[in-house]
Amino acid sequence: MSTNSKVLALKYRPVVFEDVIGQEIVSQTIFNSIKQNKIPNAYLFTGIRGVGKTTFARLVAKALNCRNGVDKLCKEKLCDSCHSISMSNHIDVLEMDAASKTGVDDVRELIDFSRYGPTSIKFKVFIIDEVHMLSKQAFNALLKTLEEPPEYKNGGALKFIFAT
């Protein structure tokens, strides 16, 4: 067996918006909003399991923070930001699985983390997967920060991406 084999879903995972298949209108709309700097506080991606919601959320996070800018998103040789976001280990792009972290304390931890500006990129991004699993109290705790996210000294802001 080959030591460099890769699961097909990972091998063909979209790296830039042009790679996304079946969601061209959504891809173009979000790409244009980022390009024109008309970025909403939050995005909500819905769909059946395996459709690519979390992958698309990472694409948006990369587009917001790529060192090359949204027009020249990294495809082959990834900048530090894009590489870290792709590997899910960027300090300013936080992914939370709301299926396992459903409580108010988990959301309060997010809110506390949002008080500090991004360390190396413009936008701090919170990707909350399975957001529908948050308890009512947890979502209520998140609501104020969602409606009025902090703006940071570097001109950036906090952006939420929800997947359900």
Give, region by region, the residue ranges found by the protein language model.
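P-loop/Walker A NTP-binding region and its immediately flanking N-terminal helices
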Residues: 1-163
